[in-house]
Structure formats: C-alpha cells, structure tokens
Amino acid sequence: MIVLFAMPSYRQGEASIAGTTAKDFGFDLSGKPSHLSDLRGKVVVLNFWASWCPPCVEEAPSLNRLHKYIQSRNALVLGVAADEDNFAFSKFIIDQGVTFPNYRDPAAKDRGSPIALSYGTSVIPETYVVDRHGKIARKIIGPQRWDSPEMLAYFDALLGQN
C-alpha cells in the first residue's frame, strides 16, 4: 500500500461524508478498553497520523494546543497511529511531547491502518471532526494549524451547539 502525504494547505474532504455516522472502533488507552461510540456526548477530533509522516510531526504541537483549548469543554483530540512498530509510536509521542490520547492501530501494516482505511483515508494526516451525536461534522485533509484563529472559531461555534 502506498500512502501519500497531503499538501500543507487546508482542504476539506468530501461534502458527502458530513452528517454520516462515524465508524465505531475499539481502542485501548493505558489498559482501558473503549470504543469511539463510548465518547458520544463529546466532540472528538479524530486524527490519523504516523511517526514516519513529516507533516504529522509538523502539526503535532498545534494539536496539543487545540486539545488543551477544547478539553474542558467536553471535547478531545484522539490520535490513531498507522504505525506497525510500537517503539516508533511511543518514541513519537515522547519526542513530540504529545499530550492528547493516542492509540496505535495494532492491525496497521504496509504504512496503512485498517481503522483509517474504513474511514476512506488515503493520505495522512487526515482528521475527522465527530460531533456530540457521533456524526462526522467535517473531514480535513492534510496538516493544519489547529490553533489558528479560523480553527478556534470553528471549534467555538461547534462546541456552542447542542
């Protein structure tokens, strides 16, 4: 499988995906099994990334800042890594100072994550904003400045909705 890196400019994904139910998947954070559906009631910024992806390194600091900005408002950033190697995954988390929850897809191979593929992800980083009802509000392709005034205004508006 070949995974392409997205260009570092904002691109919104297909409009047809907005409003669809986010695909549920199981994950384990610090020995605690969970599912994406367990997070209903929260806004989830679901970010697909990998340690070998330079644009993922580029956006990690602003994802940390976004997570800090939204976590007290019933929202979080959740990373899903397409890393086969647990050491590379752990090293990325430490080296980049990642503060938001992350899960390494244990089925990842050939630079691809079955979880990401189930969402239709073909480039990384790619991010899905999942609303409080478990619906995809937005698909964003490529690295972003997650703490830009435009992004923060988007999340302020989304978090102000019921």
Regions found by a protein language model. Name each.
Residues 24-44:
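A short beta-strand-turn-helix
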Residues 39-42, 72, 98-99, 121:
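Active-site acidic short loop of glycosyltransferases
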Residues 91-98, 105-157:
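Thiol/disulfide oxidoreductase modules built on the thioredoxin-like
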Residues 1-24, 162:
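N-terminal targeting signals for export/organelle localization
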Residues 57-97, 107-117, 153:
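Structural microenvironment flanking redox-active thiols in thiol-disulfide oxidoreductases
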Residues 42-44, 48-52, 123:
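Short pre-active-site segment immediately N-terminal to redox-active cysteine/selenocysteine motifs
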